[in-house]
Amino acid sequence: MELKEVREGLARILVPKAERIYDAPVFYNPLMALNRDISVLALKALGSRRVLDALSATGIRGIRYALETPAGEIWLNDINPNAFRLIVDNVKLNFSGELEIEGKMAVLEGEKTLVVTNADANRLMNEQFRYFDFVDLDPFGSPMEFLDSALRAVKRRGVLAITATDTGVLCGAYRNACLRKYLAEPIRGELCHEAGLRILIGTLVRYAAKYDLGVEVLLAYYRDHYFRAFLQLRNGAKTADKSMKQLGYLYQDESGKFEFENTFLPSKATAHGPLWLGPLKNQEFVEELHRLSAEHPLGSKKTQKFLGLLKDELEVPFFYDTHAVARRHGLEVRKLAGVIEILYEKGYKATRTHFSPTALKTDAPFEEVLEALRELQ
């Protein structure tokens, strides 16, 4: 395996040389640097001590956790023997001290404890029952096959950080797969990315509720080809019930107008969901991440700006894409800033959204958004 060295944050990492990232014997995606940046900032803000990077590949995420956060014990796991050997090499590259290797486990004891394992992620998480403060799942595709085990491995007041890259499934391109994996009806069109993210969270909430665990969404977002969510678990049946009450369904008609309802069973056959209708962020948490991003070494130049957009985004479910609304009603497309300004003048709140550069989140009714577009003609 031919290797090259890359730098990200404070880490130096050996990665395979390959023309296409998917052809490499061990997976490494430089485009996920922003994802890893936000994860490092989140772990730094939380101060979690015991961390599991369950699907570690090159080890870049777990090594950045060890170098850049207060975490004291970091486990890096991958079932691929090539990945295990590469993680060991990368740990040696970034940390002094003797790495003790025995079979499919390597341990480095020092100021930080690093544990590298070559194991099936589900088996490892089931064996380490309620051991970790922070469990990170960053799979290729859907995280659902790992979720039950992750909920066993994390402490009952711990944090799950979960990535899903099966956006085609969650966004309705593969409806049957969404029904199978997430037990939810997806939606196509301009709302698919936010609905897909909320379907993912809604499924996680239902899984957690089986173990009498409630969920607080610290931050959830869509970016490029993936969804990402940081979920703080809350212990107790009542907190699980409270989280379940924030599930519901989305409806959208041909005009582009949408509505949603908090209910266990939908009132109409045209429902999309069940999905999460609660907040996608804890405002104080996101503000802290944005503050930390100004002083922390980052792997992506886009991280701080993206966190600023998330920080300023209005916390309401779903949005109106001005291009889609204009197209449906035979109107000319106008600048988003103009629509936002008109809504503000009428006393409504309105902001840009990270889900689309041509969309806005607002507490204004659909008719007011449509009227604002007409005023700009």
Swiss-Prot record:
GO terms for biological process: tRNA N2-guanine methylation. S-adenosyl-L-methionine binds at residues 36, 61, 78, 120-121. GO terms for molecular function: tRNA (guanine(26)-N2)-dimethyltransferase activity; tRNA binding. Residues 4-373 form the Trm1 methyltransferase domain. Keywords: Methyltransferase, RNA-binding, S-adenosyl-L-methionine, Transferase, tRNA processing, tRNA-binding. CDD domains: AdoMet_MTases. Its EC number is 2.1.1.216. SUPFAM superfamilies: S-adenosyl-L-methionine-dependent methyltransferases (SSF53335). The keyword Methyltransferase applies. The keyword Transmembrane does not apply. It is an enzyme of class 2 (transferase). InterPro entries: SAM-dependent_MTases_sf (IPR029063), Trm1 (IPR002905), TRM1_arc_bac (IPR022923), tRNA_met_Trm1_C (IPR042296). It catalyses: guanosine(26) in tRNA + 2 S-adenosyl-L-methionine = N(2)-dimethylguanosine(26) in tRNA + 2 S-adenosyl-L-homocysteine + 2 H(+). Belongs to the class I-like SAM-binding methyltransferase superfamily. Trm1 family. HAMAP family: tRNA_dimethyltr_TRM1. Dimethylates a single guanine residue at position 26 of a number of tRNAs using S-adenosyl-L-methionine as donor of the methyl groups. This is tRNA (guanine(26)-N(2))-dimethyltransferase. It comes from Thermococcus onnurineus (strain NA1).
